[in-house]
């Protein structure tokens, strides 16, 4: 739709201001008011003006302010639209002039005589052959859309190419972290073949109520404690194999391990979520259902780990990505009581940068893969915090002799 100031009135025969060959100007009623209002509207809507136009360059048809090069002429939007509609709808044979085709066309009179305006368009050499019919216009729009999509794809490719991949030192770091994970990850890639399902009758009959309304099945809890010590030991061994961790003071190492132990064990369980059996495989050997893990002592923490497992299944993480995620969790500089906070923070940044570059190298198809994966760090930190609170309830409700010494050593005295 043309701006109000540029719309011609097909039923109008008199000009706002019209000249005749041998007569003075005639004024149309209310012409001053209408011209003022239209001028105000034109001034209020400042369209895009191409850089190749000089300031206030006039339209060659009516003298109004030009907006660009249209149909081989410098014209305003009104004359461009008038010329296009005239050709597309073949209106010019029906145009007529009451004054023998002698009207002067300017920005005031342009809407009063269509014939003279069209003749002026032809006189200044506006090109009729450049006006597209409906089929050509649709084809042009389709071509514009195709080019726009191509540019988008080219930009994506360019962005992907611009994303840095690991350098030689980062590849070496990734190799060390991946090997540390593989050497301490029970059953490795063969966990599905070697897992054993916890009998369904275990963990389905909770007996001891806890203060928060959940219940603990002591038989299931006892089964879980059998695998907890080797699981914790493997996390400790993983940390000791990491570059930079052994350089930290012993006190800081202990704090970091206590803080991340549940988070890393939860991650290792979550990446072994099996949607077919709806189970997690703990410590690479015991497959459990959601209710069994919940009734066996973890309560709502069980839901969080299972939900994480379902989510991570879409990411298709490889060993290096799981290993780097564990390293990032381990090197969390916000653990309470640390002495070398700055050094630990720099260590984590080193792992994060190598991690991001490795993600660039892998070229996952999931949009915004890297920020989405980093959100899983937050989820795992929440699981660790919830487990610290849950541990207090388990201590109250379960016999002390069921707790392995290493389990108590790691999880007692944690901040809730």
From Swiss-Prot:
Residues 15-24 have a biased composition (Basic and acidic residues). Zn(2+) 1 binds at residues 59, 62, 76, 79. Residues 1-58 are annotated as: Modulating. One of its GO terms (molecular function) is RNA polymerase II cis-regulatory region sequence-specific DNA binding. Its main location: nucleus. PROSITE patterns: NR_LBD, NUCLEAR_REC_DBD_1, NUCLEAR_REC_DBD_2. One of its GO terms (biological process) is negative regulation of transcription by RNA polymerase II. One of its GO terms (cellular component) is RNA polymerase II transcription regulator complex. InterPro entries: NHR-like_dom_sf, Nucl_hrmn_rcpt_lig-bd, Nuclear_hormone_rcpt_NR1, Nuclear_hrmn_rcpt, ThyrH_rcpt, Znf_hrmn_rcpt, Znf_NHR/GATA. Residues 169-413 form the NR LBD domain. Coiled coil: none annotated. Keywords: DNA-binding, Metal-binding, Nucleus, Receptor, Transcription, Transcription regulation, Zinc, Zinc-finger. It is found in: Nucleus. 3,3',5-triiodo-L-thyronine binds at residues 234, 283. Residues 1-30 are annotated as: Disordered. Gene3D superfamilies: Erythroid Transcription Factor GATA-1, subunit A, Retinoid X Receptor. A zinc finger (NR C4-type) spans 59-79, 97-121. Belongs to the nuclear hormone receptor family. NR1 subfamily. Nuclear hormone receptor that can act as a repressor or activator of transcription. High affinity receptor for thyroid hormones, including triiodothyronine and thyroxine. This is Thyroid hormone receptor alpha. The lineage of its organism: Eukaryota, Metazoa, Chordata, Craniata, Vertebrata. The gene is thra1.
């Amino acid at each position: 739709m043309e701006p109000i100031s540029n719309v011609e009135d097909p039923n109008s025969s008199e000009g706002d201001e019209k000249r005749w060959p041998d007569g003075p100007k005639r004024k149309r009623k209310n012409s001053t008011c209408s011209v003022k209002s239209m001028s105000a509207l034109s001034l209020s809507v400042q369209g895009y003006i191409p850089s190749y136009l000089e300031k206030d360059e006039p339209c060659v048809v009516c003298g109004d302010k030009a907006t660009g090069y249209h149909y081989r002429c410098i014209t305003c939007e009104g004359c461009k639209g008038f010329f296009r509609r005239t050709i597309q709808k073949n209106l010019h044979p029906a145009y007529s002039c009451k004054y023998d085709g002698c009207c002067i066309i300017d920005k005031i009179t342009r809407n009063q005589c269509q014939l003279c305006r069209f003749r002026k368009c032809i006189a200044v050499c506006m090109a009729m052959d450049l006006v597209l019919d409906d089929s050509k216009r649709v084809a042009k729009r389709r071509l514009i859309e195709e080019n726009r999509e191509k540019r988008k794809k080219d930009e994506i490719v360019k962005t992907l190419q611009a994303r840095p991949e690991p350098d030689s030192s980062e590849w070496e770091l990734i190799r060390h972290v991946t090997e540390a994970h593989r050497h301490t990850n029970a059953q490795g890639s063969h966990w599905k073949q070697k897992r054993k399902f916890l009998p369904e009758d275990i963990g389905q009959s909770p007996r001891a109520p806890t203060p928060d309304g959940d219940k603990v099945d002591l038989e299931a809890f006892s089964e879980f404690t059998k695998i907890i010590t080797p699981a914790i030991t493997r996390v400790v061994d993983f940390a000791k194999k990491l570059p930079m961790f052994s350089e930290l003071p012993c006190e800081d190492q202990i704090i970091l391990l206590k803080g991340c132990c549940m988070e890393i064990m939860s991650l290792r369980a979550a990446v072994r979520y099996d949607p077919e059996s709806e189970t997690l495989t703990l410590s690479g050997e015991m497959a459990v259902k959601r209710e069994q893990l919940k009734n066996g002592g973890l309560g709502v923490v069980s839901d969080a780990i299972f939900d994480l497992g379902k989510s991570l299944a879409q990411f298709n993480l490889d060993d290096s990505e799981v290993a780097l995620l564990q390293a990032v969790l381990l090197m969390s500089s916000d653990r309470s009581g640390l002495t070398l906070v700055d050094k630990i923070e720099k260590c984590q940044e080193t792992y994060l940068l190598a991690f991001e570059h490795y993600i660039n190298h892998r070229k996952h198809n999931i949009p915004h893969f890297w920020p989405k994966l980093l959100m899983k760090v937050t989820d795992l930190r929440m699981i660790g915090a919830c487990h610290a609170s849950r541990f207090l309830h388990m201590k109250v409700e379960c016999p002390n002799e069921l707790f392995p010494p290493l389990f108590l050593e790691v999880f007692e005295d944690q901040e809730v």
